[in-house]
From Swiss-Prot:
Its EC number is 2.4.2.17. One of its GO terms (cellular component) is cytoplasm. The gene is hisG. The lineage of its organism: Bacteria, Pseudomonadati, Pseudomonadota, Betaproteobacteria, Burkholderiales. It is found in: Cytoplasm. It catalyses: 1-(5-phospho-beta-D-ribosyl)-ATP + diphosphate = 5-phospho-alpha-D-ribose 1-diphosphate + ATP. It comes from Leptothrix cholodnii (strain ATCC 51168 / LMG 8142 / SP-6) (Leptothrix discophora (strain SP-6)). Belongs to the ATP phosphoribosyltransferase family. Short subfamily. This is ATP phosphoribosyltransferase.
Length: 214
């Protein structure tokens, strides 16, 4: 059995056409089903629905043979034990710094200065500000990032931005986009060796589908 780990939402929806190009169809809708293990049109393949942040862990430890995860999630996870053969170029967005509209960000990030930042992506934020020579006090949050600058909890946030409409609605401005994000196919390295005859054609078919989309 080949097990593919996916998360609900945008990544799931944008992965489906790539799977279809490889001859695979998920035969139940995760939005309508309470099942966490979904069948496909192939008797030897199933899909497990997990939280986006858990996809790399499932693949790393063999709970799934392969999965689809955002670059942001993979950096935060560390990527240990994972083969990342394909940038699927789906679920695209960017990692950015945002602040209140009246906050002087340029002065706050002069070399040697210190800034307080709220984020879910602590590894990414820490590296970004280290590269700028700025001391950063990180506050780990799991949601509603936009509140942090508005309540004085933090000077800035580091978060994923797609259209920027949520920032604008909360009177924040995007001051520094610094990383393009898309989703990757990740494969368990041991599974690639043990199930190579079944996994390699699947990986190649998905790669061909990505290339065909340009």
């Amino acid at each position: 059995m080949i097990t593919l780990a996916l998360s609900k939402g945008r990544i799931f929806e944008e992965t489906l056409p790539l799977l279809a190009a490889a001859g695979i169809e998920v035969t139940e809708d995760p939005e309508k089903s309470r099942k966490l293990i979904l069948p496909t049109n192939r008797a030897d393949m199933q899909v497990v629905m997990v939280r986006a942040t858990d996809v790399p862990t499932y693949v790393q430890y063999g709970g799934a043979d392969l999965g689809v995860a955002g670059k942001d999630i993979l950096i935060e996870h560390g990527g240990e034990g994972l083969y990342q053969p394909i940038d699927l170029r789906i679920a695209r967005c960017r990692m950015s710094v945002a602040t209140r509209a009246d906050f002087d960000y340029d002065s706050a990030v002069k070399k040697g200065s210190r800034i307080r930042v709220a984020t879910k992506y602590t590894a990414i934020a820490r590296q970004h500000f280290a590269d700028k020579g700025v001391h950063v006090d990180l506050i780990k949050l799991y949601g509603s990032m936009e509140l942090a600058p508005l309540t004085g909890l933090a000077d800035a946030i580091v978060d994923l931005v797609s259209t920027g409409s949520t920032l604008k609605a909360n009177h924040l401005r995007e001051v520094e986009p610094f990383m393009e994000i898309s989703s990757r196919l990740v494969v368990n390295q041991a599974a690639l060796k043990l199930k190579r005859e079944r996994l390699r054609p699947l990986i190649d078919a998905i790669a061909a589908a990505v290339a065909a989309r340009g």
